[in-house]
Amino acid sequence: MISSKDGIIGFAIGDAMGVPVEFTNREKLMRNPITSMVGFMGHNVPKGTWSDDTSMTLATMDSITKANGNIITNDMADKFLEWMEQGKYTPDGKIVDIDRTTLRALGKYKTTRRSAVNCGCTSNTDNGNGSLMRMLPIVYYSYLNWLEQDKILKLVAGISSVSYTHLRAHETGAYLV
């Protein structure tokens, strides 16, 4: 049986292969496909460097495992702050990227210390894929705990709301899980 570790490693490898060509248009990639690790392109980082997607996935996984399998969104937000401010969960102690919505939400959490689920951004333009990228640990969590669809939607909404409170982010995350 494939373990959750295999999925996380596969996620990190895929992310590291995509980082150099992030924001590259499809036509250019069709002419010059990525078939191995490369570096020093879009984000000007060495090959094998992963992005915020993997870092936040690792932070999510760390939060769940250190909380004995519980979901504690404030702890998760604290781990995200460690990543954002200290470079934890990165290959070299430096963050590669952070989207504006996540930056604003974590800034609000740090400043107010309100419940993390009340710090996510609510605008119609704050519905990117940022929370979707950290759902793999939630897939494992939901599977291991035999969660039904209504509980998955509630769980995903809470976790997404640390940065993204828009309904689209919640529904797409729940659909993935």
Regions found by a protein language model. Give the residues of each.
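An N-terminal structural lobe/cap that precedes and organizes the functional/catalytic core
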Residues: 1-52
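Short, well-structured active-site flanking segments
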Residues: 17-25, 72-75, 146-150
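Acidic catalytic motifs of isoprenoid enzymes
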Residues: 41-131, 142-147
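Active-site glycine-rich loop that binds ribose-phosphate moieties when present
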Residues: 152-162
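Conserved small/polar residues in nucleotide/adenosyl-binding loops
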Residues: 165-174
